[in-house]
Amino acid sequence: MRIKNIKVSGFKSFCHPVNLQFKQHGITIVVGPNGCGKSNVVDAIRWVLGEQRVKHLRGGSMEDVIFAGSSYHKPSGMAEVSLTFSNPKGDTLHQYADYTEIAVTRRLYRSGESVYMINKTPVRLKDVRELFMDTGVGGTGYSIIEQGRVGEIVSSKPLERRTLIDDAAGIVKFRFKRETAEKRLEETTQNLFRVTDVLGALSEQEDGRS
């Protein structure tokens, strides 16, 4: 999977819709003077992939990602970012493997309402994270390395490094499936206990009538 383009509207300094195209071969470099919004492009990518930690978006609250207005432009009512990936080899979950392109969209309104979409279909944040599981692309993945990140990894705790290594090794998906299965098993066990209690109560009532 490779990033094909990113569409940004009302996000941070992007008051007007902007569509950035990325080369499918080689390296794309975003250049410009200080304060022109280069870091906001990276923030937009991280945000649309499900980043929930405001400090990693360089803001005080999540609403800070919505364009706040300027001397010449009114504040935006929402922020929207859409990130399109080329998927020629079907390197995704089976339900999206047949798509040659996958577009992930995130919207945030000033009311606090948040919307996620995959190929224009509303989904949950969980679905977005599962889509990129084991690819390193997610908001907390190893594909986005900002200033100071290498130092953080070197000085991080063993458990934190283990999480990063597991992601790179491609075993996060299997751990997630195991945890999901264990949770369902626990729920099924609890339901079975409740059914057993109900059957026991009914049996006692039946014996009382006899």
What are these regions (language model features)?
Residues 2-210:
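Gly/Lys-enriched N-terminal cap/neck module of very large, oligomeric protein machines
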